Amino acid sequence: MARTIKIFDTTLRDGEQTPGVNLNLQEKLEIAKQLVRLGVDVIEGGFAIASPGDFESIMTLSRNLKGVTIASLCRSVEKDIDRAWEAVQYAESPRIHTFIATSDIHMKYKLKMTEEEVLERAVSMVKRAKGYCSNVEFSAEDASRTREEFLYRVVEAVIKAGATTVNIPDTVGYSTPLEFGRLIRNIRNNVPNIDKADISVHCHNDLGLAVANSLAAVENGAVQVECTINGLGERAGNAALEEIIMGINTRKDYYDITHRIDTTQIYRASRLVSSLTGVNVQPNKAIVGANAFAHESGIHQHGVLSEKTTYEIMTPESVGMGTNRMVLGKLSGRHAFEDRLKEMGYSLSDEEVKTAFAKFKDLADKKKVVTDKDIEALVDENIAVPEIFVIDSFQINSGNKMISTSTVSVRKDEEIITEAATGDGPVDAAFNAVERATGVNAELVHYRIKAVTEGKDALGEVTVKISNNNSIFMGKGVSTDIIEASVKAYLNAINRSISEIGESIISQ
């Protein structure tokens, strides 16, 4: 009989630690809703004590999501565990996830604790967590570099103290598949009470082995896999959820394992996370990359045309990457538009639908065909970013033998503010004018433009990242006019920075 594994998604916690990623509350909620549709078993919403924002997002997920376990990470420290419980207590299925490092190098240089002190701390904090919550996960940080006999003792002791899941992380992506699989097997064989808890794994990708190590662990008895959408995470990232799941699905003959994931929701989850984090998916990324199902070689093309399975071991449709459906145009009504949004996985408020529909009608006047990708770009552009400043109008004068100038008018409440500026090209001039009009000085650290669809009337999507007050803020803008898309993106990022930091950053 096939074993069933659990998928623990940490996109909103470990994934958000990707450099330059800073999700707000509404964006986290949108991603979490998609993760529920995807069918993950556990969502780690954040690190409750790390910041008020993390605490609020975990509590919001706990109050709003059903059919999924909500977890908060916490150190093996009393105040951390107390705060984690405050955040997850309203969840239908709450989990406290506590950790402490167990490797010699971490104990000596980071914790400055002995093995016995670490063991005692781990046990006492699991007991404290268990006093709040029946579902407690314990992680032995840097387990793959921990002395195995000590690791067995820690795992046995925390299970006895009440841990229902024990996580074995490859924290620095140091292990190899054979080695990591053997470690999981050794834990099963050397921890007497291991049958009273689920074995979980959390693999990092520093050597490009996170997915391979995770699958090796599953093969050797791991019950839960911790992963992120698109493999997001600090340094080289985490094991990619989509690669683990499709590896298991494609090789059912080998793994004989089941799970709850609806694979047709994978591509939508990947695009949503990419859009809201501003982290592009590489074209040759397995499963969800733009080239994942592309065939350029003549021999390969001939084979696929004759019989798809000659070169395709899975179908685009199996991960929700079907052909674009060209179903809406300028004569489409709001009802049809709203139905299409629901089919695409969006759950928007009436006001958000109204705003998105207005943008859709405006785009439909400029484009012959509006595709699903266009709609995604329109909706994702302004998810949950308060419009403190709104573009009223802009004008550009630019050429190869003149200084580029821009005049931008923005609206704040009922006031229209107009400013002009010069710059090195039309985009720079427009950004300088936006800064003068808003009174916010920022440093542009990233600018990217891409065509959402094909053709001369394609929608252009601009992503910018600005640095303000030692934080990075992302903005997105879409338009058939790339200058307008750029202005929208820059203003979007400025609005986000004001929302996060406060209006004190606006110079008078």
UniProtKB/Swiss-Prot annotation:
Outline the subunit composition.
Homodimer.
Which Pfam families does the UniProt entry name for this protein?
A: HCS_D2, HMGL-like, LeuA_dimer
A GO term for molecular function: acetyl-CoA C-acetyltransferase activity
What does the record give as the function of this protein?
A: Catalyzes the condensation of the acetyl group of acetyl-CoA with 3-methyl-2-oxobutanoate (2-ketoisovalerate) to form 3-carboxy-3-hydroxy-4-methylpentanoate (2-isopropylmalate).
Q: Provide the protein's localization.
A: Cytoplasm
Q: Where does Mn(2+) bind?
A: D14, H202, H204, N238
Which pathway, per its entry? Amino-acid biosynthesis; L-leucine biosynthesis; L-leucine from 3-methyl-2-oxobutanoate: step 1/4
The record's catalysed reaction(s) read:
3-methyl-2-oxobutanoate + acetyl-CoA + H2O = (2S)-2-isopropylmalate + CoA + H(+)
What organism is listed for this UniProt entry? Ruminiclostridium cellulolyticum (strain ATCC 35319 / DSM 5812 / JCM 6584 / H10) (Clostridium cellulolyticum)
Q: Which InterPro entries match?
A: 2-IPM_HCS-like, 2-isopropylmalate_synth_dimer, AIPM/Hcit_synth_CS, Aldolase_TIM, LeuA/HCS_post-cat, LeuA_allosteric_dom_sf, LeuA_bact_synth, PYR_CT
Q: What class of enzyme is it?
A: transferase
Name of the protein this chain belongs to: 2-isopropylmalate synthase
Question: Any idea of its EC number?
Answer: 2.3.3.13
Q: Where does it sit, as one GO cellular component term?
A: cytoplasm
Q: What is its main location?
A: cytoplasm
- Any single biological process term in GO: L-leucine biosynthetic process
- Protein keywords: Amino-acid biosynthesis, Branched-chain amino acid biosynthesis, Cytoplasm, Leucine biosynthesis, Manganese, Metal-binding, Transferase
Report residue spans for region: Regulatory domain. Answer: 390-508
Q: Tell me the cofactors it needs.
A: Mn(2+)
Q: Where is the Pyruvate carboxyltransferase domain?
A: 5-267
Regarding protein family, the annotation reads: Belongs to the alpha-IPM synthase/homocitrate synthase family. LeuA type 1 subfamily.
